[in-house]
Amino acid sequence: MAAKIIDGKTIAQQVRSEVAEKVKARVAAGKRAPGLAVVLVGSNPASQIYVGSKRKACEEVGFVSRSYDLPETTSEAELLELIDTLNADKTIDGILVQLPLPAGIDNVKVLERIAPDKDVDGFHPYNVGRLCQRAPRLRPCTPRGIVTLLERYNIDTYGLNAVVIGASNIVGRPMSMELLLAGCTTTVTHRFTKNLRHHVENADLLIVAVGKPGFIPGEWIKEGAIVVDVGINRLESGKVVGDVVYEDAAERASYITPVPGGVGPMTVATLIQNTLQACEEYHDVEEA
């Protein structure tokens, strides 16, 4: 069986076009365009690339994009003060602080300082808690993006055995909550999991997010499984690969996401969706 490719690039472009249409309609109706503030501390090259793509996506859909590039020497107090200012700014619907932050700045304190209704990354404990309670508001971008991919390909998730490999706060944990909402019987594996192969072989839906190239061999994949590879790993040769051995897995799976061009584009597209949602559902009321 040759797997159908889940084309994240195309779906992400659809999502962005849908948002752009809604923004155009808002502006035509005399409402303001949504605003996103992107905060970068220091000059981590990978972070600069991510931030650049987020800002570009914002401008393409007609958002107001505000950039705050702070030096490596920025103190935690200065960063928190900026967040307070942005929380109070009625033209800003979303605040994104690019991680990782430099040493000496407490990630948790910073993320918790962002107002939950401006937390477009979906990392605030309030938003994670709402997801756990089956009443989500702003949802973490990568997991929500994966759910969107499955929905757009009309993949029925109810009753599937879903296995999430990796238990990070950014992907694995919120992904498990999204899968429960989507009707899956969900298992989360992590570095202490025994007999990982057994779990993978029983997965109807496999989500892999560990950041290790070729971590899951293709022969472990159950015949007909749906494989979502969140990993983005650059080899010494410069080639970008996922956490799953793609060629072998694609022979056994029914659907598979490629790397690059699978999950990655959806993360930014979902950030854009979240910002529009924050604007329309939580901030328009204040202007009425």
Swiss-Prot record:
Keywords: Amino-acid biosynthesis, Histidine biosynthesis, Hydrolase, Methionine biosynthesis, Multifunctional enzyme, NADP, One-carbon metabolism, Oxidoreductase, Purine biosynthesis. It comes from the Bacteria. InterPro entries: Aminoacid_DH-like_N_sf, NAD(P)-bd_dom_sf, THF_DH/CycHdrlase, THF_DH/CycHdrlase_cat_dom, THF_DH/CycHdrlase_CS, THF_DH/CycHdrlase_NAD-bd_dom. It catalyses: (6R)-5,10-methylene-5,6,7,8-tetrahydrofolate + NADP(+) = (6R)-5,10-methenyltetrahydrofolate + NADPH; (6R)-5,10-methenyltetrahydrofolate + H2O = (6R)-10-formyltetrahydrofolate + H(+). The keyword Oxidoreductase applies. The keyword NADP applies. SUPFAM superfamilies: Aminoacid dehydrogenase-like, N-terminal domain, NAD(P)-binding Rossmann-fold domains. NADP(+) binds at G166, A167, S168, I232. Gene3D superfamilies: Leucine Dehydrogenase, chain A, domain 1, NAD(P)-binding Rossmann-like Domain. Its EC number is 1.5.1.5, 3.5.4.9. Homodimer. Catalyzes the oxidation of 5,10-methylenetetrahydrofolate to 5,10-methenyltetrahydrofolate and then the hydrolysis of 5,10-methenyltetrahydrofolate to 10-formyltetrahydrofolate. This is Bifunctional protein FolD. It comes from Klebsiella pneumoniae subsp. pneumoniae (strain ATCC 700721 / MGH 78578). The gene is folD.
